[in-house]
Design a protein with these regions (language model features):
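A short acidic/basic microdomain associated with nuclease active sites
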Residues: 1-5, 9-11
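Short connector loops at helix/strand junctions that flank enzyme active sites
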Residues: 5-7, 19-21, 45-48, 72-74, ...
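Catalytic phosphate/metal-binding cores of nucleic-acid and nucleotide-processing enzymes, i.e., regions
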Residues: 6, 22, 34-39, 44, ...
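Conserved catalytic cores of phosphodiester-cleaving nucleases, focusing on short active-site segments
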Residues: 10-14, 18-34, 53
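Mg2+/Mn2+-dependent nuclease catalytic core
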Residues: 29-56
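Nucleic-acid nuclease catalytic cores
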Residues: 54-112
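Surface-exposed interaction regions that form or flank ligand-binding interfaces
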Residues: 112-131
Length: 131
């Protein structure tokens, strides 16, 4: 029996001739007994889910030297995360990995305000005030 495939939480389509796609997996704030741990590590689950949905070739290879020559930017992926989880993810995911995967983060704070982080902003430590 095949496993049932679920879609992403948010799918956006746009760009020229609707040729750009943005897939976003979301993990909200937890209120469970172990909420502190869940809120800080929730990004791992979201990242795993989004990676399993990446069925598109992420890069092209040069015919002359076999090196990676370009990244497919038509498909972008995002993590919608509670700010504590986003803070950890931004520090732990290397910028180079985020760039190849076209991975973005949408961080939501307790007031419901959203901050957007592009792949070039990954691999850095951000203090609470940035969120």
């Amino acid at each position: 029996k095949l496993a049932k495939k679920h879609g992403v939480d948010i799918k956006l389509v746009g760009g020229k001739r609707n040729s750009e796609y943005f897939y976003i997996e979301c993990k909200g704030k937890s209120y469970a007994k172990s909420a502190k741990s869940i809120n800080r590590e929730g990004w791992l689950y979201a990242l795993g889910q989004i990676i399993t949905r990446m069925d598109v070739k992420r890069y092209s290879v040069s015919k002359t030297d076999g090196r990676i020559s370009g990244i497919n930017h038509a498909y972008k992926y995002g993590l919608g995360l509670y700010w504590e989880s986003a803070q950890v993810a931004l520090r732990r995911i290397p910028k180079e990995v985020a760039e190849v995967l076209c991975l973005h983060i949408f961080s939501v704070n307790d007031d419901g305000k959203v901050k957007y982080f592009t792949p070039s902003m990954f691999g850095k430590e951000y203090n609470k005030e940035k969120f």
